[in-house]
Every structure is written in structure tokens, then in C-alpha cells.
């Protein structure tokens, strides 16, 4: 995939109407935004365009309204909070059909530096199907397109891809630029040793990532629920642990591929187990890889955590996607905590691949110790798989 995309500095935006696709898919509780990270992430691009005298038309989806207006998924709270953050009124164009009379009037009345926010793009059923009619309507409002929503870059929707068929100038904003820089470098030209850590529940979610990374990394660390499928592939007993029987053979192939490639594949050598999946279950540490009948693995053990931490500390580039255990249960969070600590203490380039690992790092207060926390869970996974992301591919090359 070509990561060398034109960014906003390369476009003359003064006096031009710029349609910016942001990711304002934020959690709401009774109309109040409970996590503002995505709004904060969008500010550098919006502020730059304001300073340069562009007319800024923001668009985003929120949740899954499935092609019809749902009041609880309106972007009104986002418009209000952005107005406070920017110290400037963000005009909210509240049209159920997104590009309606309110939007057209608001855009027509804009002065340089003004900001308009359109209603939730997924109020339109055409959005997720990337249908021409809605792409054209969105594009008709603007002269230039800027994509700054990495979280939806793996989706070919009207507001991420379709509009670029009608707006010939299409660039990335600062957020996507940063994602391309760190994830792109990690995948294409990492400083070595390069260590990747994969966790989470299922091997099936990470099949292509494992396969792609084995061609690139020096060390691959496996933890989380997916670790038990690998342990079974090595012939160990895993009790009642989560296992994907249909992926045991695949796991064996990956163990062989790692040997062939000279990749140091690290798998758990001890586990923290319990007799039930419950936050109050009593944790028991196994002596070795084997898990007894009636028990299930819920975290990597202390010996494993030490080996994993040492590997991280000797790395120059580290990419992490997926927790090491059931992080939500205090008794089974230690593996994830130890990995996060090792990354926080490291001088390496440390990249967190969005999703649960990003949440874990932020909860632990290590967020500011990481080089880069990706804003896209699904998008960063597809990036690590080596897939082309449609929302990036559609932008102008440098």
C-alpha cells in the first residue's frame, strides 16, 4: 500500500470550502460526551484550516443508526462541545437527510474560518453502501476533501471514498498523517529489533496479522485467549480454556513458519487460571504451560510476563494489539499491566494498535508514555495485515 499521501499543508485552502471527514463516533451518556479523545484528535486539523482561512464543513458518523434518523445518535452534543474547544461557534446543520436545506444555507452563509458540522452521515442508508447519490450530495458542498478519520479508513463509504470521485483535491489531515507515519514505518522500515505483541480472545481475528508480521518482526509475542489455541497446538493440556479447535492446525503452521523465518515466537510458559469466568474467581498460577481439568486460563503467568517484558525492553520498535488476559477482572489484569509497564519504560518506538489495548493503556495512565496510540482498532488491524485501506488509497498521492 502507498502511504505517501498528500497532506493538508500541500493544498491551498484559503477561501475554499473544505469537507473534512472526522471520527466523532464518541460515547454518550444522556447526551453528554464521556470520552473526548476523538474530538481532541481532530482539533489540530480543524485549527490549521481555520488559521488558513478555509470554510470548514465537518462530517462524521456516530453509532449505527442504520440509515434512519435517531435522536440519541445526533451530532448536536459534538457541535456544542467543539464550539467550546475551538472558542468559536460550530454551526450545526441539523438535517435528517444530512445534505438538506439547513446544510446548504449554512454553507452558503459561511465566511473564511467558519465551521459547520453536518448531521450523522449514517442517517443516510446510502452512506455505508458507498452509493453515488449521497457521495455527490456531500461533494456538492465543497471544493476540497480532507480525510482525518483513521478509525473508518478501512471502510469504503460515501464520506470516506465516494466523495473523492467528485472532489479532485483529496488530502489527509494531521491525524491520518500521524497514523501513516508511525504504523507505516513500523510495518515498512522498523528500527530493529522489532517486537510485535498480539493478544485478545481469538486467533481467527488475527490470522492475517500473524501471517503478515512473521515476515517482518524479530520477535512475536502471543498472549490473551488466543494463546491457549497455540498451547494446544504444542501438545499441552488447556482444561476449559477458550480454544478454537479449527485453528489448532493453523497455529502449528505458524509455529513452524516462525522457526523457518528465524523469528523468536514467544508463547506462555505459565498461566493464571480459575475454575470459573468471574471477577471474584480465585486466581491460581500454574507451574508450567499445562492447565488442569476444570480450570480455564484467564491471564499469562508471572514467569511469562517477565520473559515478555524482557523482550520488550530489548526492542527498538514495539507494536501491541490486544490484552494479555481478562483485563476487566482485577485478578487477571497483571499480564496486561506488566506489558504496558515494560512499554512505558522502554526507549523504543512504542505503538498501541487501538481498541482494547488503547483502553488498557489509558486506564493505567501510561498513555502519555507511548510514542503513538492508534485511533482505529479495526483500521490498525487491517493495516498490520498489510491490507490496503480504501479511505487512504482514495487520497491524492504526494
UniProtKB/Swiss-Prot annotation:
The keyword RNA-binding does not apply. The keyword Kinase applies. Keywords: ATP-binding, Cytoplasm, Glycolysis, Kinase, Nucleotide-binding, Transferase. One of its GO terms (molecular function) is phosphoglycerate kinase activity. GO terms for biological process: gluconeogenesis; glycolytic process. It is found in: Cytoplasm. It comes from the Bacteria. Coiled coil: none annotated. Pathway: Carbohydrate degradation; glycolysis; pyruvate from D-glyceraldehyde 3-phosphate: step 2/5. GO terms for cellular component: cytosol. InterPro entries: Phosphoglycerate_kinase, Phosphoglycerate_kinase_CS, Phosphoglycerate_kinase_N, Phosphoglycerate_kinase_sf. Belongs to the phosphoglycerate kinase family. Monomer. This is Phosphoglycerate kinase. It comes from Clostridium botulinum (strain Kyoto / Type A2).
Amino acid at each position: 500500500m502507498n502511504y505517501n499521501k498528500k497532506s493538508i499543508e500541500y493544498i491551498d485552502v484559503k477561501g475554499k470550502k473544505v469537507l473534512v471527514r472526522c471520527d466523532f463516533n464518541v460515547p454518550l451518556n444522556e447526551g453528554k460526551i464521556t470520552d473526548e479523545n476523538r474530538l481532541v484528535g481532530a482539533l489540530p486539523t480543524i485549527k490549521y484550516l481555520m488559521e488558513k482561512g478555509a470554510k470548514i464543513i465537518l462530517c462524521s458518523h456516530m453509532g449505527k443508526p442504520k440509515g434512519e434518523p435517531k435522536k440519541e445518535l445526533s451530532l448536536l452534543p459534538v457541535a456544542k462541545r467543539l464550539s467550546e474547544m475551538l472558542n468559536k461557534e460550530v454551526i450545526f446543520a441539523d438535517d435528517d437527510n444530512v445534505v438538506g436545506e439547513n446544510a446548504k444555507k449554512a454553507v452558503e452563509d459561511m465566511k473564511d474560518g467558519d465551521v459547520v458540522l453536518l448531521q450523522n452521515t449514517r442517517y443516510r442508508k446510502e452512506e455505508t453502501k458507498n452509493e453515488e447519490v449521497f457521495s455527490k450530495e456531500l461533494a456538492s458542498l465543497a471544493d476540497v476533501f480532507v480525510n482525518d478519520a483513521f478509525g473508518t479508513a478501512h471502510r469504503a463509504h460515501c464520506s470516506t471514498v465516494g466523495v473523492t470521485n467528485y472532489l479532485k483535491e483529496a488530502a489527509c489531515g494531521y491525524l491520518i498523517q500521524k497514523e501513516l507515519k508511525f504504523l507505516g514505518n513500523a510495518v515498512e522500515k522498523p528500527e530493529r529489533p522489532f517486537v510485535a505483541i498480539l493478544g485478545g480472545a481469538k486467533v481467527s481475528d488475527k490470522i492475517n496479522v500473524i501471517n503478515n508480521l512473521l515476515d517482518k518482526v524479530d520477535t512475536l509475542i502471543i498472549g490473551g485467549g488466543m494463546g491457549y489455541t497455540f498451547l494446544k497446538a504444542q501438545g499441552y493440556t488447556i482444561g476449559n480454556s477458550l480454544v478454537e479447535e479449527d485453528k489448532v492446525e493453523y497455529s502449528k503452521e505458524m509455529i513452524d513458519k516462525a522457526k523457518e523465518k528465524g523469528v523468536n515466537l514467544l508463547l506462555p510458559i505459565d498461566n493464571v487460571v480459575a475454575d470459573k469466568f468471574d471477577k471474584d474467581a480465585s486466581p491460581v498460577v500454574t507451574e508450567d504451560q499445562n492447565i488442569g481439568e476444570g480450570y480455564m486460563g484467564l491471564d499469562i503467568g508471572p514467569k511469562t510476563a517477565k520473559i515478555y517484558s524482557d523482550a520488550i525492553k530489548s526492542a527498538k520498535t514495539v507494536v501491541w494489539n490486544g490484552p494479555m488476559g481478562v483485563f476487566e477482572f482485577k485478578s487477571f489484569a497483571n499480564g496486561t499491566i506488566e506489558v504496558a509497564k515494560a512499554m512505558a519504560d522502554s526507549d523504543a518506538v512504542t505503538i498501541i494498535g487501538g481498541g482494547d489495548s488503547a483502553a488498557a493503556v489509558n486506564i493505567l495512565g501510561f498513555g502519555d508514555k507511548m510514542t503513538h496510540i492508534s485511533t482505529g482498532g479495526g483500521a490498525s488491524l487491517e493495516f498490520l495485515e498489510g491490507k490496503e485501506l480504501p479511505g487512504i488509497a482514495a487520497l491524492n498521492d504526494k
